[in-house]
Amino acid sequence: AYEALVGAYVISLFVALKNVGLWVATAAWMAGLVAVAEVLAPSFSTTDALKLMAVGYVGQELAHIVTGEKTFQSTYQFKTPSWPMLLLEHTYFLLPLCIDALVHMKESFASWIVAHNYVVRCKLTNKEDKRALQTVVDFVTKEDPARDCTAHWWYQRLNGDVKEAFTHVMECPEMMGMFWKRFRSDCYNVEAIPAMNEIYVASSHHNNNSDTVFYTQHCDGPWSVYPFCHVYRVMLAVNENKQVETHFTMERSGGCLSDGDAVGFDYNREIHVISDLPTKNVDRRITCKLHYVVYPKCFGWAGKVKGTLATWYNTTARNLFLATIKPRGLVWKFMAWNVIFTTKRVRELEMYAGLNNVVFAAALYVAGQFIHPRFFMCATSFTHYCMYIATYHVREGINFGVFKRNVVFFKTIALTHLCVNYLMHFEYDPVSLAMILVGYGLSTAATVALGMDQTYFGVELGVMKPNFVSGFPYNCVPHPMIVGSMIGLLGFHKMASFRAALPYLVPMHCAMYMTHMIQEQVRDIYKKDWGKGGKGKARGGARKTKAA
């Protein structure tokens, strides 16, 4: 009987919606629900069904409470005598409305797994901002700190004009505006963290003390795993600087910050370093370090907690840092060495794996111990394809270094699954071995010819110009990276014992690969350029570059 009711509902929507595409999507969704109900209904009693409905309703309401989001129903319920009629209309159109909202999202779901570029920039130029910066310069000049090591004045210990000046630049429209250019104001909160702020004066040299950290690639904080929330450090150049450059390793950008230039970066995740140019500054380099916590509005207090954690760590690290600027005795010299050693190891972890990725993979592995023996393999074998597809779809505002790190990390896990299972079920099959060696050999040769950056969307993401390759293997095989990878994958599948144990693994790899290849073909962002000189070389070289 319920099938007839569903059919009547879908037919009535065809007239009511007056939108064929939306109606087709709604009908397909209802058909899917009916199919699932046919499978699950026999295993549920009436009591179980009522419990499930109650859990769903309570969970929905709890989600609204946690996120602080009002429901549409709450805006009219009990407000007028006719509100039940509006409730019926609301319920009738609820599913197509949800689908329509999904289609018209301001930001695609694909952006959730994209390696976004979170570095933000601005420049303070108006009279009020310049006056505030000059107040800071005058303060430092009057204090006249030693030039052979860094000097620090914490915001909370400042007084008078200099504190007012610091507060001004911390809250000025230009400073806050650079965050709103990156984060939607209707979705995020941006709040200052005064307890972390300071006036910083650079030293003229560094000599195996904790100052050396600044000249070593590093991340500032340890809370990179805390999801969806950011603590920003903003480096604001107070005076002229033509000597010291600030570089962001993964974003591949950098330069001298001078006279009101400001750059903000994720305190816990962004690898950065400073270096000296041959030119010398006339005066000491003065910088204001400002900090902000940025979190989704729906996180509420949970977002603020990241700011609290960062403040605690910054205070602890600050005390250690000050004690090791001029280390005395073996203990403090060892502590200074330990600061540098730990900084380098954390940098290596973030650059080549990413603590987020490591923790995520570890969590999936642990979950797999309770869910299914194959869960970890299924959850991590196709992640890199999803990242390819999502990144190619979004393309704007991508941190190329982080993207490349992430896909290589998960691709390595995927290949490890293939190799481990191949060895576990190994039986001698010369054709299988030959296909793997030839296929991945061809794919590797194509990667070497293109280079790693071009292989991983370097051209599509605008970080490099295309290198039109006409030599081996592009002069022998069309699309050698795709062809080679597919041959290698099918080589795994060729071995009977591997195929019997994991009949769907390689077909799923091939399906994901083909999905992305079709995406590139359909959304060919360079198709207007093929007749302008690249022609066949470009098709064989710069495009279709992903290795499985």
Please give the residue ranges for each predicted region.
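Catalytic core of Fe(II)/2-oxoglutarate
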Residues: 243-341
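Conserved double-stranded beta-helix
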Residues: 156-241
